[in-house]
Amino acid sequence: MLRSCTAGLRSIWALRGRREGAPRLSMDLQPARRLFSTEKVIHKDWALPNPSWSKDLKLLFDQFMKKCEDGSWERLPSYKRRSTQESEDFKTYFLDPKLVEEERLSQAQLFTRGFEDGLGFEYVIFKNNDEKRTVCLFQGGPYLQGVPGLLHGGAMATMIDIALGSCTGGAVMTANLNINFKRPVPLCSVVVINSQLDKLEGRKLFLSCNVRSVDEKTLYSEATGLFIKLDPEKSST
Ligand SMILES: CCCCCCCCCCCCCC(=O)SCCNC(=O)CCNC(=O)[C@H](O)C(C)(C)COP(=O)(O)OP(=O)(O)OC[C@H]1O[C@@H](n2cnc3c(N)ncnc32)[C@H](O)[C@@H]1OP(=O)(O)O
Protein backbone atom coordinates (compact mmCIF):
# COMPACT_ATOMS: atom_id res chain seq x y z
CA MET A 1 0.00 0.00 0.00
CA LEU A 2 2.88 2.32 0.81
CA ARG A 3 4.34 1.68 -2.61
CA SER A 4 1.05 2.48 -4.34
CA CYS A 5 0.77 5.62 -2.23
CA THR A 6 4.26 6.71 -3.32
CA ALA A 7 3.26 6.13 -6.91
CA GLY A 8 0.09 8.08 -6.22
CA LEU A 9 2.12 10.88 -4.71
CA ARG A 10 4.37 11.00 -7.78
CA SER A 11 1.41 11.25 -10.11
CA ILE A 12 -0.24 13.78 -7.83
CA TRP A 13 2.87 15.94 -8.01
CA ALA A 14 2.76 15.60 -11.77
CA LEU A 15 -0.80 16.86 -11.64
CA ARG A 16 -0.18 19.70 -9.19
CA GLY A 17 -2.24 22.72 -10.01
CA ARG A 18 -3.84 21.08 -13.03
CA ARG A 19 -7.37 20.92 -11.73
CA GLU A 20 -9.40 21.60 -14.81
CA GLY A 21 -9.83 25.30 -15.26
CA ALA A 22 -7.75 26.05 -12.18
CA PRO A 23 -5.44 29.00 -12.60
CA ARG A 24 -1.76 28.44 -11.98
CA LEU A 25 -0.27 30.87 -9.57
CA SER A 26 3.37 31.71 -9.95
CA MET A 27 5.57 34.45 -8.63
CA ASP A 28 6.24 35.93 -12.06
CA LEU A 29 2.60 36.82 -12.64
CA GLN A 30 1.74 40.49 -12.89
CA PRO A 31 -0.04 41.69 -9.72
CA ALA A 32 -3.35 42.36 -11.52
CA ARG A 33 -3.35 38.89 -13.04
CA ARG A 34 -2.37 37.37 -9.72
CA LEU A 35 -5.30 39.08 -8.03
CA PHE A 36 -7.65 37.91 -10.79
CA SER A 37 -6.34 34.34 -10.47
CA THR A 38 -6.71 34.39 -6.70
CA GLU A 39 -10.31 35.58 -7.08
CA LYS A 40 -11.00 32.69 -9.46
CA VAL A 41 -9.57 30.20 -6.95
CA ILE A 42 -11.69 31.67 -4.14
CA HIS A 43 -14.94 31.49 -6.12
CA LYS A 44 -14.24 28.05 -7.56
CA ASP A 45 -16.47 25.15 -6.58
CA TRP A 46 -14.06 22.47 -5.32
CA ALA A 47 -16.61 19.67 -4.94
CA LEU A 48 -16.08 18.56 -8.51
CA PRO A 49 -13.83 15.87 -10.03
CA ASN A 50 -10.20 16.66 -10.72
CA PRO A 51 -7.44 14.44 -12.14
CA SER A 52 -6.37 13.24 -8.68
CA TRP A 53 -9.73 11.54 -8.07
CA SER A 54 -9.49 7.75 -8.11
CA LYS A 55 -11.70 5.55 -10.27
CA ASP A 56 -13.77 4.68 -7.19
CA LEU A 57 -14.39 8.31 -6.33
CA LYS A 58 -15.33 9.25 -9.89
CA LEU A 59 -17.66 6.25 -10.17
CA LEU A 60 -19.48 7.08 -6.95
CA PHE A 61 -19.65 10.75 -7.95
CA ASP A 62 -21.31 9.80 -11.26
CA GLN A 63 -23.79 7.53 -9.46
CA PHE A 64 -24.83 10.30 -7.10
CA MET A 65 -25.02 12.88 -9.89
CA LYS A 66 -27.57 10.55 -11.54
CA LYS A 67 -29.58 10.52 -8.30
CA CYS A 68 -29.62 14.32 -8.45
CA GLU A 69 -31.47 14.28 -11.76
CA ASP A 70 -34.95 13.82 -10.20
CA GLY A 71 -34.27 16.44 -7.53
CA SER A 72 -34.28 14.04 -4.55
CA TRP A 73 -30.55 14.59 -4.02
CA GLU A 74 -28.41 17.67 -4.50
CA ARG A 75 -24.68 18.11 -4.73
CA LEU A 76 -23.44 20.70 -2.25
CA PRO A 77 -20.94 23.09 -3.77
CA SER A 78 -17.83 23.81 -1.71
CA TYR A 79 -15.78 26.98 -1.66
CA LYS A 80 -12.59 28.05 0.03
CA ARG A 81 -14.48 30.91 1.61
CA ARG A 82 -17.98 31.23 2.96
CA SER A 83 -20.34 33.48 1.02
CA THR A 84 -20.54 37.08 2.16
CA GLN A 85 -24.04 36.42 3.53
CA GLU A 86 -22.90 33.37 5.54
CA SER A 87 -19.91 35.29 6.89
CA GLU A 88 -22.18 38.16 7.92
CA ASP A 89 -24.54 35.69 9.64
CA PHE A 90 -21.69 34.26 11.69
CA LYS A 91 -20.17 37.67 12.40
CA THR A 92 -23.29 38.64 14.32
CA TYR A 93 -22.31 36.01 16.89
CA PHE A 94 -18.65 36.97 17.05
CA LEU A 95 -18.80 40.69 17.43
CA ASP A 96 -15.58 41.33 19.31
CA PRO A 97 -13.34 43.06 16.74
CA LYS A 98 -10.29 42.28 18.89
CA LEU A 99 -10.84 38.56 18.30
CA VAL A 100 -9.74 38.44 14.67
CA GLU A 101 -8.44 41.42 12.75
CA GLU A 102 -10.47 42.26 9.66
CA GLU A 103 -7.32 41.98 7.53
CA ARG A 104 -6.63 38.45 8.81
CA LEU A 105 -10.25 37.54 8.24
CA SER A 106 -9.95 38.57 4.60
CA GLN A 107 -7.27 35.86 4.19
CA ALA A 108 -9.38 33.15 5.80
CA GLN A 109 -10.07 29.94 3.94
CA LEU A 110 -11.77 26.66 4.80
CA PHE A 111 -8.74 24.59 5.80
CA THR A 112 -9.96 21.40 4.11
CA ARG A 113 -9.74 23.26 0.81
CA GLY A 114 -6.27 24.66 1.40
CA PHE A 115 -4.31 21.78 -0.17
CA GLU A 116 -3.29 21.33 -3.77
CA ASP A 117 -5.16 18.79 -5.88
CA GLY A 118 -5.09 15.30 -4.42
CA LEU A 119 -2.72 16.02 -1.54
CA GLY A 120 -5.27 16.70 1.18
CA PHE A 121 -9.03 16.53 1.44
CA GLU A 122 -10.81 15.57 -1.78
CA TYR A 123 -14.52 15.32 -1.10
CA VAL A 124 -18.01 15.99 -2.28
CA ILE A 125 -21.24 15.95 -0.28
CA PHE A 126 -24.67 14.98 -1.58
CA LYS A 127 -27.76 15.90 0.41
CA ASN A 128 -31.22 14.39 0.55
CA ASN A 129 -33.33 17.12 2.13
CA ASP A 130 -36.48 15.02 2.57
CA GLU A 131 -34.60 12.25 4.36
CA LYS A 132 -32.45 14.74 6.32
CA ARG A 133 -29.28 12.89 5.43
CA THR A 134 -26.10 13.37 3.47
CA VAL A 135 -23.49 11.18 1.83
CA CYS A 136 -19.93 12.42 1.76
CA LEU A 137 -17.46 10.81 -0.63
CA PHE A 138 -13.96 11.40 0.74
CA GLN A 139 -10.48 10.57 -0.53
CA GLY A 140 -7.77 11.51 1.98
CA GLY A 141 -4.49 12.35 0.25
CA PRO A 142 -0.86 11.69 1.29
CA TYR A 143 -0.51 14.91 3.30
CA LEU A 144 -3.12 13.59 5.74
CA GLN A 145 -0.96 10.74 6.98
CA GLY A 146 -0.90 9.79 10.65
CA VAL A 147 0.52 6.33 11.32
CA PRO A 148 2.59 5.50 8.19
CA GLY A 149 0.30 4.49 5.34
CA LEU A 150 -2.83 5.44 7.26
CA LEU A 151 -5.10 8.45 7.41
CA HIS A 152 -4.66 10.64 10.51
CA GLY A 153 -7.58 10.30 12.93
CA GLY A 154 -7.81 14.08 13.18
CA ALA A 155 -8.33 14.29 9.43
CA MET A 156 -11.11 11.74 9.73
CA ALA A 157 -12.62 13.70 12.62
CA THR A 158 -12.54 16.85 10.50
CA MET A 159 -14.42 15.16 7.70
CA ILE A 160 -16.92 13.66 10.14
CA ASP A 161 -17.54 17.14 11.58
CA ILE A 162 -18.08 18.58 8.10
CA ALA A 163 -20.27 15.64 7.04
CA LEU A 164 -22.47 15.93 10.15
CA GLY A 165 -22.58 19.71 9.76
CA SER A 166 -23.83 19.31 6.20
CA CYS A 167 -27.05 17.76 7.62
CA THR A 168 -27.78 20.99 9.48
CA GLY A 169 -28.63 24.39 8.10
CA GLY A 170 -27.98 27.96 9.10
CA ALA A 171 -25.64 29.14 11.82
CA VAL A 172 -24.70 26.15 14.01
CA MET A 173 -21.64 25.14 16.02
CA THR A 174 -20.36 21.71 16.95
CA ALA A 175 -20.82 21.28 20.72
CA ASN A 176 -19.94 17.62 20.99
CA LEU A 177 -18.35 15.08 18.69
CA ASN A 178 -17.97 11.45 19.73
CA ILE A 179 -16.06 9.11 17.43
CA ASN A 180 -15.33 5.41 17.64
CA PHE A 181 -12.41 4.58 15.35
CA LYS A 182 -12.98 0.91 14.55
CA ARG A 183 -10.54 0.25 11.70
CA PRO A 184 -7.69 2.37 10.33
CA VAL A 185 -8.32 4.03 6.97
CA PRO A 186 -5.66 3.37 4.31
CA LEU A 187 -4.14 6.60 3.01
CA CYS A 188 -5.39 7.62 -0.46
CA SER A 189 -8.40 5.31 -0.25
CA VAL A 190 -12.00 6.42 -0.70
CA VAL A 191 -14.50 6.23 2.13
CA VAL A 192 -18.22 6.94 2.26
CA ILE A 193 -19.64 8.91 5.20
CA ASN A 194 -23.39 8.43 5.69
CA SER A 195 -24.80 11.09 8.03
CA GLN A 196 -28.27 11.78 9.31
CA LEU A 197 -30.19 14.09 11.57
CA ASP A 198 -31.61 11.88 14.33
CA LYS A 199 -33.37 14.41 16.52
CA LEU A 200 -34.09 18.10 16.79
CA GLU A 201 -34.72 19.41 20.30
CA GLY A 202 -35.08 23.19 20.48
CA ARG A 203 -31.70 24.55 19.38
CA LYS A 204 -30.03 21.13 19.69
CA LEU A 205 -29.45 18.95 16.66
CA PHE A 206 -28.45 15.34 17.33
CA LEU A 207 -26.68 13.71 14.42
CA SER A 208 -24.93 10.44 13.67
CA CYS A 209 -22.83 8.95 10.92
CA ASN A 210 -20.81 5.94 9.87
CA VAL A 211 -17.72 5.75 7.70
CA ARG A 212 -17.40 2.75 5.40
CA SER A 213 -15.30 1.48 2.55
CA VAL A 214 -16.65 1.81 -0.98
CA ASP A 215 -17.69 -1.88 -1.02
CA GLU A 216 -19.38 -1.27 2.36
CA LYS A 217 -17.58 -4.31 3.83
CA THR A 218 -15.40 -2.32 6.23
CA LEU A 219 -16.86 -0.12 8.93
CA TYR A 220 -14.08 2.36 9.73
CA SER A 221 -15.81 4.67 12.21
CA GLU A 222 -19.07 5.53 13.85
CA ALA A 223 -19.79 8.92 15.32
CA THR A 224 -22.44 11.06 16.94
CA GLY A 225 -22.51 14.82 17.12
CA LEU A 226 -24.42 17.53 18.90
CA PHE A 227 -24.74 20.79 17.01
CA ILE A 228 -26.30 23.90 18.54
CA LYS A 229 -28.16 26.53 16.58
CA LEU A 230 -26.63 29.81 17.61
CA ASP A 231 -28.81 32.10 19.63
CA PRO A 232 -28.93 35.60 18.08
CA GLU A 233 -29.44 37.01 21.57
CA LYS A 234 -26.10 35.64 22.75
CA SER A 235 -22.58 36.40 21.60
CA SER A 236 -20.44 33.25 21.68
CA THR A 237 -17.26 35.09 22.61
C1 LIG B 1 -22.88 24.01 2.15
C2 LIG B 1 -22.65 23.68 3.51
C3 LIG B 1 -21.95 22.40 3.66
C4 LIG B 1 -21.51 22.27 5.01
C5 LIG B 1 -20.09 22.54 5.03
C6 LIG B 1 -19.80 23.48 6.10
C7 LIG B 1 -18.39 23.85 5.98
C8 LIG B 1 -17.94 24.36 7.22
C9 LIG B 1 -17.89 23.27 8.18
C10 LIG B 1 -17.08 23.75 9.23
C11 LIG B 1 -17.46 22.97 10.42
C12 LIG B 1 -16.74 23.56 11.51
C13 LIG B 1 -17.44 23.21 12.77
C14 LIG B 1 -16.59 23.71 13.85
O1 LIG B 1 -15.43 23.55 13.84
S1 LIG B 1 -17.37 24.52 15.11
C15 LIG B 1 -15.98 24.90 16.15
C16 LIG B 1 -15.91 23.97 17.30
N1 LIG B 1 -16.96 24.28 18.19
C17 LIG B 1 -16.88 25.29 19.03
O2 LIG B 1 -15.92 26.02 19.09
C18 LIG B 1 -18.08 25.49 19.89
C19 LIG B 1 -17.71 26.16 21.21
N2 LIG B 1 -18.88 26.19 22.03
C20 LIG B 1 -19.76 27.22 21.98
O3 LIG B 1 -19.53 28.19 21.28
C21 LIG B 1 -21.00 27.09 22.78
O4 LIG B 1 -20.84 26.17 23.81
C22 LIG B 1 -22.22 26.68 21.91
C23 LIG B 1 -22.47 27.73 20.81
C24 LIG B 1 -22.01 25.29 21.26
C25 LIG B 1 -23.45 26.58 22.80
O5 LIG B 1 -23.55 27.74 23.50
P1 LIG B 1 -24.96 28.51 23.70
O6 LIG B 1 -24.71 29.53 24.70
O7 LIG B 1 -25.52 28.90 22.39
O8 LIG B 1 -25.89 27.34 24.23
P2 LIG B 1 -26.04 26.83 25.73
O9 LIG B 1 -24.76 26.71 26.44
O10 LIG B 1 -27.13 27.61 26.36
O11 LIG B 1 -26.56 25.34 25.43
C26 LIG B 1 -27.78 25.14 24.73
C27 LIG B 1 -28.21 23.72 25.01
O12 LIG B 1 -27.19 22.82 24.50
C28 LIG B 1 -26.66 22.02 25.56
N3 LIG B 1 -25.21 21.85 25.33
C29 LIG B 1 -24.33 22.79 24.97
N4 LIG B 1 -23.12 22.24 24.81
C30 LIG B 1 -23.25 20.93 25.10
C31 LIG B 1 -22.35 19.84 25.12
N5 LIG B 1 -21.06 19.98 24.80
N6 LIG B 1 -22.84 18.64 25.43
C32 LIG B 1 -24.14 18.46 25.74
N7 LIG B 1 -25.05 19.46 25.74
C33 LIG B 1 -24.59 20.67 25.42
C34 LIG B 1 -26.92 22.82 26.84
O13 LIG B 1 -26.97 21.97 27.96
C35 LIG B 1 -28.29 23.40 26.51
O14 LIG B 1 -29.25 22.40 26.64
P3 LIG B 1 -30.67 22.72 27.29
O15 LIG B 1 -30.37 23.17 28.69
O16 LIG B 1 -31.27 23.82 26.45
O17 LIG B 1 -31.45 21.44 27.21
Swiss-Prot record:
Transit peptide: 1-36
Modification note: Phosphorylated.
Gene: THEM4
Primary site of residence: membrane
Active site (UniProt): 161
GO terms classed as biological process: fatty acid metabolic process; negative regulation of phosphatidylinositol 3-kinase/protein kinase B signal transduction; regulation of mitochondrial membrane permeability involved in apoptotic process
Protein name as it appears in the record: Acyl-coenzyme A thioesterase THEM4
Stated family: Belongs to the THEM4/THEM5 thioesterase family.
